[in-house]
Amino acid sequence: MARDYYGLLGVARNATDQEIKRAYRKLARELHPDVNPDEAAQARFKEVSTAYEVLSDPEKRRIVDMGGDPLESGGGAGGFSGAGFGGLGDVFEAFFGGMSGAGGGQRKPRGRVQPGADSLLRTRLSLAECAVGVTKHLTVDTAVLCDACHGSGTHGNSKPVRCETCGGAGEVQSVQRSFLGQVLTSRPCPTCRGAGETIPDPCHKCGGDGRVRARREIAAPIPAGVANGMRVRLAAQGEVGPGGGPPGDLYVEIVEQPHDVFVRDGDDLHCTIRVPMVDAALGTTVVIDTILDGPTELTIPPGTQPGEVSVLRGHGMPKLRSGVRGDLLAHLDIVIPTKLDGKQTELLRKYKALRDRDRAEVMSAQSEHNSGLFARLRASFSGR
């Protein structure tokens, strides 16, 4: 008597392929030996696997629907046959949601044509180059399209064929024993490296990779306002992918060189200006050779003190992709002379004498004012 394969899976005779697969996955989760060590469950798992093997095969299912039993008709033994596990994939899929590499839950092979990797170059820029922008001509060692096969990887008129090792799946599977029981593992096919295809007659120049290593000259436009550590992206200027795949991007990282005069802080520039003591006292004008505007006058007001900061608005670095510019901040260092000649010494002594006289006059006037005030206060109290 023919076995009731539909009953073993608990589905109707008119169940769809998806309904049959869902029923099998559910039972496999419950009965798999790694989950349920009971001997009765293991026997039931074999029956369920056999039923799925039969009903997932259109020809075998047709025999069942006609009242026959395909396994009794030479269709093969049930239980743990390779087909019964759908290449072991359906059991694995039942537990891990389609992560297996074979059967109904297999991943697609990645294919021979893959996107290329991104590349990174570093280039040194002066502060002036960062300020105005520049086009740097760089040399890069990268993967380029093979000019012999134009990326196909084949020689002459040969074409890729399905990998015999993995059957085109791109990966192979194995069952390993662990303390949890038998574990199914998948790994990329060692023959085709996950592509699912091999090339019987590969290109003599690139060896079937579709690309070769070469040195390229690249013109990299660097916009004004870049700073140290920034990366400029050049689309599709990276490495060509395996099989002639689309190239990745090239990133140019900025290495900003220190400047002799200016120190950068974001979009602002800082510098130190040495001002003679007399000029700081009387006021003066100094000229600063700015990065973008050349020689520019800076006014030092009379009485400027050491450490004060004078600002030139809009004379700093440009903001990236913006017309706005930062400021230039001049830190004033008042220089006191260490050596004086006789005339200079005499003049300074005269200045000191004048200053001392003025100070004495101020103090005398203040003293007289205080004396008059105290006298008025005494008179006020004595008159009471």
Swiss-Prot record:
Zinc finger (CR-type): 133-215
Residue ranges constituting the J domain according to the UniProt record: 4-68
Annotated CDD domains: DnaJ, DnaJ_C, DnaJ_zf
Any single GO BP term: response to heat
The protein's required cofactors: Zn(2+)
Subunit record text: Homodimer.
Domain characteristics, as noted in the entry: The J domain is necessary and sufficient to stimulate DnaK ATPase activity. Zinc center 1 plays an important role in the autonomous, DnaK-independent chaperone activity of DnaJ. Zinc center 2 is essential for interaction with DnaK and for DnaJ activity.
Protein name: Chaperone protein DnaJ 1
Species in which this protein is naturally found: Nocardia farcinica (strain IFM 10152)
Higher taxonomy: Bacteria, Bacillati, Actinomycetota, Actinomycetes, Mycobacteriales
Gene that produces this protein: dnaJ1
